[in-house]
Amino acid sequence: MKSDKGENMLNQFSRTQLLLGKEAMDKLANSRVAVFGIGGVGGYVCEALVRSGVGEFDLIDDDKVCLTNLNRQIIATRKTVGRYKTEVMKERILDINPDVKVNIHNCFFLPENADEFPFEEYDYIVDAVDTVTAKIALVMKAKEKNVPIISSMGAGNKLDGSQFKVADIYKTKVCPLAKVMRRELKKRGVRKLKVVYSEEIPTRPLEDMSISCRTNCICPPGAEHKCTERRDIPGSVAFVPSVAGLIIAGEVVKDLCKA
């Protein structure tokens, strides 16, 4: 980012500046962060980053707020069900800091559309998407463009937020998603990747959601993403993915301040 927004943010972020200092706050104010996936993890990443003074966001997600998001996603309320997550998050960000610039992309990131995103303009990338295909493509693009990236590993089917850790992907253990990511990244020659993962053994869901979900809260006929058609819907609680999101945001802030 090129503009200097630090002075305008002084009063709102004065307590943060007491810890980070003015130079760091200026860096944050002039940083552009792309958050891929505005869900249980990504929503809290955005929340903490805007409250920390980040000056520009790119929000990428094709989903709309669903009734089943109410148990854990910071953007989910009865009033926002049915609306695009990116649009709701943008409104929330601007309510917190109207001086922030927010760019929204109502689409799902895939290798096929990777070139549509201005990676060279990002100062940091947060991977909070669910699918391995998208995560791998995102990491590869970030490495190609030499943009710092941090990836969220599995936060579903877990109950203990205290077991999240920050590590290189090749030093992770227990997490099934991290295991797959290690294998796929090794094939592609990726030597390192900062991730947030949990060492908690995943809890087996008490019910088969793929069979029992019949709410059809906003899933219209023919929709690409329908709860009733997903093979495996993980269990979730409010106090786990939120922790992962806040840890990720902390890493982003610290890295941007050191840059």
Regions found by a protein language model. Give the residues of each.
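N-terminal charged helix/coil linker that caps or initiates catalytic domains
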Residues: 1-34
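Glycine-rich phosphate/adenylate-binding loop
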Residues: 2-6, 120-121, 134, 144, ...
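Conserved N-terminal Rossmann-fold NAD(P)-binding element of oxidoreductases
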Residues: 35-37, 60
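Hydrophobic/small residue at the entry helix of a nucleotide-binding pocket
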Residues: 41-42
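Glycine-rich phosphate-binding loop and adjoining beta1-alpha1-beta2 segment
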Residues: 54, 59-97
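Conserved SAM/SAH-binding loop
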Residues: 106-114
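Short, well-ordered coil/turn residues at beta-beta hairpins
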Residues: 128-129, 152
